Amino acid sequence: MPVHATPAAESQIISKPEVVRRTANFKPSVWGDRFANYAEDIITQTQMQEQVEELKQVVRKEVFTNAADDSSHQLKLIDEIQRLGVAYHFESEIDQALERIHETYQDIHDGGDLYNVALRFRLLRRHGYNVSCDVFNKFKDTNGDYKKSLVTDLSGMLSFYEAAHLRVHGEKLLEEALVFTTTHLQSASAKSSLLKTQITEAVERPLLKTMERLGARRYMSIYQDEASYSENLLKLAKLDFNVVQCLHKKELSDILRWYKELDFARRMPFARDRIVELFFWIAGIYFEPEYVFGRHILTKLIEITTVMDDMYDAFGTFEELVILTEAIDRWDASCMDQLPDYMQPFYITLLDVIDEVEEELTKQGRSYRIHYAKEIMKNQARLYFAEAIWFHEGCTPKMDGYMRVAASSVGNTMLSVVSLVGMGDIITKFEFEWLTNEPKILRASNTIFRLMDDIAGYKFEKERGHVASSIDCYMNEYGVSEQETIDIFNKRIVDSWKDINEEFLRPTAAPVPVLNRVLNLTRVVDLLYKRGDAFTHVGKLMKDCIAAMFIDPVPL
């Protein structure tokens, strides 16, 4: 007589072990359909664009013809053009003016007050001229300290503070200047001062680390209260901001339509739903109208990378991640059948987006670029998988070994390389090869991103179960406390900014627009991770920034 299994026993025989998945329980998007439907007002936008073109001619004459014989006045106007976000309209004129000023620098560098000397130093240094910081020795007393009389010159102190941030390694004079100015500006900001708002914002985030478009938006309200402001320049800045904002709104609406069709938020609920924040990130890398194509493809690929990150970081099992990594490396739609159901929409979207990019690049005669985009995405998966191995094996690597993987996996290399895909003829194979090999400026940016990210998310990641972070690795290897580790990391971040500054000094290893992609990316990182992880945990900071960039036009 055969033995028949009971229903319960039969169920035990055929059921598979339940898969235990880690999830971070990310909060949903705070934006809903806020940006989904944008109605273009073509007539109004055309009228604004015509006014911009007219004002550009007026400002060009004011700054580069009428002020050409007064270098101090012209430098101030150039600084205002840059801070108001319209320097991209006058790049060649600014370069020519600064070259002329640099040629006479040795003749005039001993003259001028603190404001003008610091402004001249900052603008020349920022544009690659390796001018000496010895020019500031004149502001020291016989004891080698900065003169106490400088403290009451708040505009001069603020100018000196901004200049000190362009220091490179070994510039003790500027290190002392930064301590001196920061201390006294913080004290001044606590008191009633006409410059209080400007000082408070500068101490929180100096110009070097400020996202161009956000900085421009904030500076407009400061600039219009100055006694000697240029009405034409201010009007140009406001109109230009609104014209570009309209363009960004249209782009964001198009991206959201694509994102909604993918239905990622429902099909992959384990991943962060942050498409609006990601577009903000990319607009920080390049906001200019000429980079429409670049923003389009980079936003799509950073969305795909964010989902990939959350798969490798938490939701995917190790066995699934092995299959996914192999599939991405093979880059073949036939791999779909081997993937778990939830991974398939992600994988086909990755292939489709790269196909879309390749089609457009072929039309442009730049099809060679797709190789770099594809390879950098493959490499991103390999880096994520290396971290998954650490977690699977319960491994806490040595700090150097951790950084070799994690400094690149953080995503800066991928974003920097792919950002070149959407640029013009200034980009050749050389620039792709150069960035792919992670030169000093990119290594510095990667270090800043990785360490700031790990500091900002340390407690959250520990609570949910996560691969060892740089903080864990350093504490484990050197036997120091969490706070000691963070202090050491903050010093490394400071040194990495000096590396970035050095890379802008002439002769540069790559065209300045390429360096600017990395710098702008690092500025976004500083904004989002200085006070916690504002990208993952969207709060007032991110909401206010997105409203300023994409919702509220500047009042004219």
From Swiss-Prot:
Where along the chain is Mg(2+) 3 bound? D453, E461
Q: Where's it found, cell-wise? A: Cytoplasm, Cytosol
* Root EC class: lyase
Summarize where Mg(2+) 2 binds, as residue positions. D309, D313
Domain of life the protein comes from: Eukaryota
Report one GO cellular component. Answer: cytosol
Its annotated pathway reads:
Secondary metabolite biosynthesis; terpenoid biosynthesis
Q: In which tissues is it expressed?
A: Expressed in ripe fruits and roots. Not detected in vegetative tissues.
Q: What Gene Ontology molecular function terms does this protein carry?
A: magnesium ion binding; pinene synthase activity
Per the record, the major location class is: cytoplasm
Could you identify this protein by its name?
(-)-alpha-pinene synthase
